[in-house]
Amino acid sequence: MNCFLFTLFFVAAPLATASYGSSSGGGGGGSSYLSSASSNGLDELVQAAAGGAQQAGGTITPANAEIPVSPAEVARLNQVQAQLQALNSNPVYRNLKNSDAIAESLAESSLASKIRQGNINIVAPNVIDQGVYRSLLVPSGQNNHQVIATQPLPPIIVNQPALPPTQIGGGPAAVVKAAPVIYKIKPSVIYQQEVINKVPTPLSLNPVYVKVYKPGKKIDAPLVPGVQQNYQAPSYGGSSYSAPAASYEPAPAPSYSAAPAQSYNAAPAPSYSAAPAASYGAAPSASYDAAPAASYGAESSYGSPQSSSSYGSAPPASGY
């Protein structure tokens, strides 16, 4: 093995000396490790590849090695810099950059990527305002998240079990005060920031479909029945318009159909058919039939003692 390595070194040493030359042949500066023949061949290849536009290898310096920038490229770069400065000085862009919109989009992206692996909680806040729709994703565990919808976009369609659907739209901002509703949601399918879940409600076999849409779509917000009185308060803009619809429909229906029916059909019937029949049919017949018959019969009885005592009985008895 050692003999083979020695033979290989003995053959390769003259070839290396012939190709690269000795250290004294390259000059004291050591600027080139190639011989004159190899250097000339390399320059020819470079000139052929560059079309004669490339300088010789010995004349290239760091100063002339950079490619000069064209005037069109300089103008385009200046325009881009001007646009960037104008964008940074725009107050709308600064407000958007400093607002929660970026955090909201990141939260929705995180929701779209992680919701399939675990459960989330959708929390309806205590106050739902008719402003800009905002949703915030709060991680509550390794695979658990909370989506808090704070401000749905108008119009709001609120469906309650005991009330018809009420729409809050137009006018000033309407505030709906309700107790927080927390739903435990299983992994679901999301399409364009849209969550459709089938949530079983406590103490009920009927599921509730909760839809979380992106801004600009209708939101179905199921509220607990206990907030019905607070929602119909006339102090709020949207509730004051929907409360008369519930107050005018049940109240006049019993007042105009039940009460007049009893006042004009039941009460006059006993007053005009029962009382006059008893006053004109029973009392006059008893006063004109019984009383005169008794009075004339009594007079005949009064006359009978007279006829029996004085005219009929006494004289014949005394005469015979």
From Swiss-Prot:
It is found in: Secreted. Pfam families: Chorion_3. Residues 1-18 form the signal peptide. GO terms for cellular component: extracellular region. Keywords: Repeat, Secreted, Signal. Its main location: secreted. Sequence repeats lie at residues 178-181, 258-261, 266-269, 274-277, 290. Transmembrane segments: none annotated. InterPro entries: Chorion_S36/S28 (IPR008449). Residues 259-320 are annotated as: Disordered. It comes from the Eukaryota. Coiled coil: none annotated. The tetrapeptide (A-A-P-[AV]) repeats found throughout the protein are also present in many proteins constituting the protective envelope of other species. Belongs to the chorion protein S36 family. Chorion membrane (egg shell) protein; plays a role in protecting the egg from the environment. This is Chorion protein S36. The lineage of its organism: Eukaryota, Metazoa, Ecdysozoa, Arthropoda, Hexapoda.
